[in-house]
Amino acid sequence: MPQPIPKKRKTYTNNPRNAAISMVSSQHPLNVRPSGNLYLESGPASGATREELMGDFALFPEELLLEVLGFVDDAQALKNLSHASRVLYAYLYDEELWKKHYTQKAQAQEKEGVEPPKIKWRGSWRLSILGLDAQYEAKPQIPGNMLCSDVLFRPFQCSQVDYTSIFWRVIKEEELYHRDSLATQEPLDEVLPSGRIPRLPESSLTQEVFDKSWSNKPFIMTNSDSSRWPHWDLAALLERFADVKFRQEAVQWPLSLYSQYLAKNRDESPLYLFDCNSKAMQTLKSEYVVPEVFQKDAFKVFEKCRPDHAWLIIGSQRSGSTFHKDPNCTSAWNAALVGRKLWIMLPPDVVPPGVSTDDDESEVTSPVGIAEWVLSGFYNDCVNNTSAQIGITFPGECMYVPCGWWHMVINLDDSVALTQNFVPSIRLGNALNFMKNKKKQVSGFRPAEVKNALEEILAACQDDEDAETIRNWVRKFDELNLKENLQNEDCGELLESELPAMPILELFKLLLTKNGKTEELAKGLEDLAKLEKSELAKVTGKSEMWTKLTEAPSFSFGFALNE
């Protein structure tokens, strides 16, 4: 009997994925021009010069001028100054200046427990703070090349960026992968060219397969069932939670106000709704099911003292997050409910272009926003890095972000998403390593909640070194008599002078034991030891075996040089 011919799997072309960043910029509303235009002056200028129109302010470097203006907390004074000349008007037209003016006040009032003043959104921070309708906004034109300034022009250029045009190659390719993965319900992994993020059907991804093959690599989980994830578009959320306040980075606004901001703003980096503690989120958490392979979460043992880990995310087109690693060496999943998201990912040991860190990554500096990063060519540098993984999640798809991986996310559309951080049991060693060797970078834990958990575990555990460490910290906590705001502050925001590093590692080990996770803990500690040996070899350039050999009393190379 003839054997059936195996079905040939589709293959895909390795097309270039460079961004099309050679774009024509829109004209600035006040005719501010890029600095390079200074070299294109065609003839002698007529009328007052920039210096004359700025007076003594002309002595200030531009960055310093805007910094000084940022300290003025009287909106009317800023408005009056802007009327002194059309050049000063241009500097005081800067959206970031007015955004800081509002958010700094709002943050200070929030800390004091004072309700920030209500604001009616009018399409920009400047218009909203001054209470002006857009139809009455003056736009005096700067003549010729009188004001050529990248400080003013570049943020405007970034606020006009069209990512669907810039990333058209990637979008076209990812749309094909998305369609094919749903049509075939088969994994798209080995058949993809390098640098692409694989797609795996949720129905075929078992815990064993995840633990063995995928826990340390990014992938996109697909599901053809349209009811797999909640249908939470902005309109549906507004019907239910219009007056509920959500966290949007530096502010807490009702969803109705944020929706107006989302519909129209001029920000270079639009505000991102990233909320975990609103009344709405407490309700929404019960309306979705975590994918089965992500349910084995070692951090569950922290219970009441666990850092925030589940968020609703809403962002306008162009919003997103710059390169970062998720906290406490956790992994994450991110389900796109509305809108497309572009993901740029790099392994833990590959620092992204345009980002700098110190040796232990306690200080991460990314000097530019997302649009600036893309337009400056750093994205194209990433594409040319063979380690980079780039992909797009479409509504209904779920991205898996392995612990320690660098990732940047860009919203190509107005977007709604769900995300959770977790520690896969198979990656427990990574979390233990982080807690032991990067104590100062542990974040999200709140002292008062941790103290309660420590006291509870002390009452049930046997005396050992970990218990003694915990007991000493609890004693120190009581002696400090911390103010209530510090007791409930994220430990990552506290100085060591305010509170010694919390014994999170010791607590974690005892909680795992208490919850019957002794086998997982033993395996995690074994992996921790391997990670430490590997890190030591990187630092010293010597393996453990080499160190043992060279430390032996009778060690020699055994060369017979006299023969």
Residue ranges and their predicted role:
Residues 2-398, 408-563:
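N-terminal accessory scaffold of Fe(II)-dependent oxygenases
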